[in-house]
């Protein structure tokens, strides 16, 4: 059994989340229970609790008992002309008899991997007027630098992301959303003791009077 504890600090707010994952030795299914601090803030409750059943690379089922929201996800991949093609179908809905807080949503995601350095991805939400097309290019022999331009056809806008990995588990990522003029910088570090850390800052370039938004996260993994 594996346990994960995550802490997040955003401005003057601090949140926490915990996940327990259990994989039967005779099966390739995985059971997970995740809870945020909302499940304990006002005494034990189902708020913030997510139950997950998954078979990695095949399907995933998420259930939020408090709101009765359900998410189904099915994925598959195959070789086509020596190129890896991956497809993911995601449907989100609610089992609550009352009016749904969020409408049902169905999304299709596909990717075509040309080689270890080049991949093309496409995302489309059924009923929407457009899709997102992303190209990923990993530069260099060790592919430590990744460049990812993305075009949103619905908003006719580009997003750009550049990630640089370093020896020792450090990585720096910069993203820019042209439609919102939002610039984000992330620094992450993976520790050899089963922990990871992330510090992020975002800047609203459309209103430079706004202070940058700062976020710090820490994640700890344990074997039980």
From Swiss-Prot:
Q: Write down the InterPro entries for this protein, in alphabetical order.
A: OEP24
Report the transmembrane regions from the record.
Answer: 2-11, 17-28, 33-42, 56-64, 71-80, 102-111, 117-126, 131-140, 155-166, 170-178, 181-189, 213-222
Q: Which residues lie on this side of the membrane: Chloroplast intermembrane?
A: 12-16, 43-55, 81-101, 127-130, 167-169, 190-212
Which membrane topology describes this protein?
Answer: Multi-pass membrane protein
Which cellular components does GO assign to this protein? chloroplast outer membrane; etioplast membrane; pore complex
Give the primary localization class.
plastid
Q: Which GO terms describe its biological process?
A: regulation of monoatomic ion transmembrane transport
The chain's Cytoplasmic topological domains, given as residue ranges, are 1, 29-32, 65-70, 112-116, 141-154, 179-180, 223-224
Per UniProt, the keywords (alphabetical) are: Chloroplast, Ion transport, Membrane, Plastid, Plastid outer membrane, Porin, Transmembrane, Transmembrane beta strand, Transport
Subcellular location(s): the record lists:
Plastid, Etioplast membrane; Plastid, Chloroplast outer membrane
- Gene Ontology MF: a single term: voltage-gated monoatomic cation channel activity
Q: Which family does it belong to?
A: Belongs to the plastid outer envelope porin OEP24 (TC 1.B.28.1) family.
The record's function comment reads: High-conductance voltage-dependent solute channel with a slight selectivity for cations transporting triosephosphates, dicarboxylic acids, ATP, inorganic phosphate (Pi), sugars, and positively or negatively charged amino acids.
* Subunit structure of this chain's protein: Homooligomers form large rather nonselective pores in plastidial outer membranes.
User: Would you tell me the protein name for this molecule?
Assistant: Outer envelope pore protein 24, chloroplastic
Look up and give the organism this protein is from. Answer: Oryza sativa subsp. japonica
């Amino acid at each position: 059994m594996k346990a994960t504890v995550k802490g997040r600090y955003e401005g003057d707010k601090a949140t926490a989340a915990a996940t327990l994952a259990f994989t039967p030795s005779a099966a390739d299914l995985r059971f997970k229970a995740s809870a945020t601090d909302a499940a304990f803030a006002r005494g034990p409750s189902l708020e913030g609790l997510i139950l997950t059943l998954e078979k990695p690379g095949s399907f995933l089922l998420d259930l939020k008992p408090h709101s009765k929201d359900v998410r189904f996800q099915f994925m598959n991949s195959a070789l086509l002309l020596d190129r890896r093609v991956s497809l993911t179908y995601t449907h989100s809905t609610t089992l609550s008899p009352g009016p749904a807080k969020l409408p049902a949503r169905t999304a299709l995601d596909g990717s075509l991997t040309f080689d270890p350095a080049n991949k093309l991805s496409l995302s489309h939400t059924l009923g929407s007027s457009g899709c997102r097309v992303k190209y990923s290019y990993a530069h260099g022999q060790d592919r430590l630098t990744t460049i990812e331009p993305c075009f949103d056809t619905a908003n006719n806008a580009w997003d750009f992301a550049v990630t640089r990995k370093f020896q020792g588990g450090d990585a720096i990522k910069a993203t820019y959303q042209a439609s919102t003029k939002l610039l984000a910088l992330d620094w992450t570090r993976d520790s050899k003791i089963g922990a990871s850390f992330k510090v992020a800052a975002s800047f609203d370039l459309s209103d430079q009077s706004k202070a940058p938004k700062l976020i710090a996260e820490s994640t700890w993994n344990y074997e039980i």
